Amino acid sequence: TGNYATRELETFYIWNTATDLATFKQGLQFFDFGSQNWGYADVLGNIAYFASGEFPIREDLDAGTLHGNPPYLVRDGTGGNEWKPLGGPQPADQAVPYEVVPFAQVPQIENPAAHWWVNANNDPIGNTADNDPLDEALAGTGPYLSPGYDEFRAARITELIKSELNLIPTPPGTPPGDGVISMADMERMQADVNQMEGKRLAPYFVGAVDRAGLGGAPAALSSLLNPTIIDARNRLASWTYNAPAGFDTPGDPGTPTAQELVDSVATTIYNVAVGRLMNRTFDARLAAEGIGYRQGTTEGVRGLIRVLSRVPFTG
């Protein structure tokens, strides 16, 4: 929140002498400026994840309603959606003089049954997966944390780990797993170039071309069908969603494989197509309304996924 005095130095003072998970959690109570993701591991084999920070509870969200604009837009300051005042004495380790989501309800996990966990600035509880961060409930409080996260990165890491451990079928463009994760596997994951957003959006372009060749397709769509478009469609359909970077260890890319060439061309087609689609939808509408603002790539991709998942895509 950043509006009140905090005691982060107390956190690190406690951690400097911590010998177990309980003491680590004790120190975490004083890290209140902003919100961070923390990983924990000790010599006894314990692992844990914690989100830190204080999350004030909004009056309207706590009541299960939304009063006016959502909290990620400018809100009406005349009442009805303020931070809830404290219902009792302010805890000694709390910086914000308002009711906050209890620490036990802040995203965290200790010694998960899977023996691993993933975090990459993603939504730690999944409330934004349906493009609505306000429609869940958490023990009577509005569980709102943020309107958006870097979701594809953590999704790909999770997919890679599950694939390497043979928990899921090997995804396209991913080496088969052997049931264990080595240091070499971790290095490969770190250098992964798979484009998860392409996996979500490219099929819409493929489907649009397929529908263009069917009877009854809109004239504006069927008139665009030509050998070049069909070739682009086939390249997208053959894409493993990898975007080859052209560099390899120790710096010599060598001769690209046939699949890498296919993926490189498909990556180019996809990125140009998505950029043009954003330009002709969101950008065009904003310009028509006289709005100079243009959404960033993250917001644009999120918007496309939201719209295309709800409205039939005709191209």
Model-found features: residue ranges?
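Conserved, charged catalytic cores of large soluble enzymes
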Residues: T1-R7
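Acidic, low-complexity N-terminal propeptides/linkers enriched in Ser/Thr/Asp/Gly that mediate export
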Residues: V43-I47, G53-L61, L66-Y72, W117, ...
